[in-house]
Design a protein with these regions (language model features):
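Interfacial helix-loop-helix junctions of multi-pass membrane proteins
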Residues: 75-81, 139-152
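Interfacial aromatic-anchored transmembrane helix boundaries in multi-pass membrane proteins
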Residues: 30-41, 66-102
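Short helix-perturbing small/polar motifs within transmembrane alpha-helices
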Residues: 2-6, 21-23, 28, 85-132, ...
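C-terminal TM-helix exit segments that contain a strictly Trp-centered aromatic cap at the helix terminus
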Residues: 46, 70, 131-141
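Alpha-helical transmembrane segments and their helix-entry boundary regions
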Residues: 60-64, 121, 151
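Juxtamembrane helix-entry segments on the extracytoplasmic side of multipass membrane proteins
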Residues: 43, 88-89, 147-152
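Hydrophobic transmembrane alpha-helices
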Residues: 2-61
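Alpha-helical transmembrane segments of multipass membrane proteins
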Residues: 27-31, 49-50, 54, 69, ...
Length: 152
């Protein structure tokens, strides 16, 4: 797959198709649930990290933005088949916002410097996951009025 800065004229469409495909993969990952209260664990974060690693910061974040927008528009793509703006404003909303931010961070860290090796990719994914969980826990604390310790 080409880096965003290596795209030739006409290839932005290819990038958008990749972003849409990873948005759909993230939606599919929402249906694979490990039920833990108060927020279920799914394969969404895996697909978010994969999109960012392969597509880079801009298209990786775009893929997650597509996923979130599909859910806001009413398609049942969020965990448990949920949809609508209420999900974004609920206990899992911070995590959804975190997917976009985390994808951007992972993509940026992977693309910074030379050719990424496994260690840099692992560190980038870890940093992205930490950002997703920081935003998710913050949102959960605000919405559910929990302390950070209770939210974790």
């Amino acid at each position: 797959m080409n880096r965003e800065d290596d795209l030739h004229p006409g290839e932005p469409v290819r990038g958008m198709v990749y972003a849409a495909m990873f948005g759909a993969a993230t939606a599919a990952g929402a249906w694979l649930i490990i039920p833990l209260p108060p927020v279920p664990v799914t394969l969404q974060t895996f697909f978010m990290a994969l999109a960012a690693t392969l597509l880079g910061p801009r298209l990786g974040a775009m893929s997650q933005g597509v996923y979130v927008l599909l859910g806001i528009m009413g398609l049942p793509v969020f965990s448990g088949g949920k949809a609508g703006l209420g999900v974004l404003l609920g206990p899992t909303g911070g995590y959804l916002v975190g997917f976009v931010a985390g994808a951007w961070l992972i993509g940026l860290l992977v693309r910074t410097g030379g050719r990424p090796g496994p260690v840099r990719i692992a560190l980038a994914v870890t940093a992205g996951y930490l950002l997703v969980y920081a935003l998710g826990v913050s949102g959960l604390c605000l919405i559910a009025r929990l302390s950070p310790v209770e939210a974790v």
